[in-house]
Amino acid sequence: MKYSHQLVIGSLAVFVLTACSGSPTQRRQAKDDFEYLETPEFSQWQLPEDAQPQFYPNFDIPSGEFSGGTGRQVDIRPPQQVLELIPGARTERQNGEVTLWLLRAEEADRVWQTAVDMLTQRNIGIREQSENDIETDWVTWVSEDEEVEIGSRYSISRFQANNRHGFKINLIDWREGSEEKPVSATNKERYNAFLTNLVMARYDADLRAEAALKAQELVKRIPISMGSDRSGFPVIIARTPYNVLWQRLPTLLPTMGFELEERNQSQGTVKAKYAAPDDEFWEEIGLQPIDLAPGTYTFLFGDLGNRTSINVTDASGKPVEEELLKSMVPVLAHVADQTKDKKEAKSE
């Protein structure tokens, strides 16, 4: 599902959600009929007086009071996933609410400010606002999964619990067309995720823009050396912030012979396939080839504040030997300087 939005008269934010082809009913309901709803009530099984019944509980239907839709009320659309775009954040979904947990206060403050900026940028009205709580006005969603325009209102809050910082989005009011209705569990879960993803996307875009600017303004070379992580294990240390180094990876690693396959900035992982560069490359940089067998490897990047740790694991998830990491240090340092010099020459 894709997001787009348009602004209409009256500062009303309208979000357009596009989906697959077919009518809204076809996308929300099961394809077959609902004759099972006409099934008559079960009657008590009558046994002859001299019969000795044997009961097996394996297939007993649990007794109890169960609530939920049936037939056409059952929404078959897959759950809306929350995008993991904030490094270090953990997402918790409970009773349809979405909570982001962060360890550092400055990260939580940035997420909060991102949400405030996103509401302003997208012309979402605010009914009430305090230091830690926001109640929005109606947000209109135009979705191909719905027959009418959908309106929703949210409460957004931030708080602390168990030495962590929480950021929560909760759908509080629901409207279909001009008619207000109770908030269903399905809609609460789905449209909480939609608004959370808008905040996530804005945070990610801001972070990328900031990192790109820092990378452009960085004039001194990146010192790279061997060191150890917080657990004392040997790692490569790049003396530059994580976000700055991340922006340069698509240039650095391919130059060394690594073809990028997967990247996940929030988890700090890059999966790449290695094929040793030719002799000309090693002669040009004046270093011995690294003793690394061709294959798939995963780079693990850790945020150490103004530094970044780098480790490498093989296809089985086993860390490569310390000696191999040491042999990669001068190569990585040379390539970092070389790619930076080429970028500066191009800008001039």
Swiss-Prot record:
GO terms for biological process: Gram-negative-bacterium-type cell outer membrane assembly; protein insertion into membrane. PROSITE patterns: PROKAR_LIPOPROTEIN. InterPro entries: BamC, BamC_C, NlpB/DapX. It is a lipid-anchor. A lipid is attached at C20 (N-palmitoyl cysteine). A lipid is attached at C20 (S-diacylglycerol cysteine). Part of the outer membrane protein assembly complex, which is involved in assembly and insertion of beta-barrel proteins into the outer membrane. Part of the Bam complex. NCBIfam families: PRK11679.1. Belongs to the BamC family. This is Outer membrane protein assembly factor BamC. It comes from Vibrio atlanticus (strain LGP32) (Vibrio splendidus (strain Mel32)).
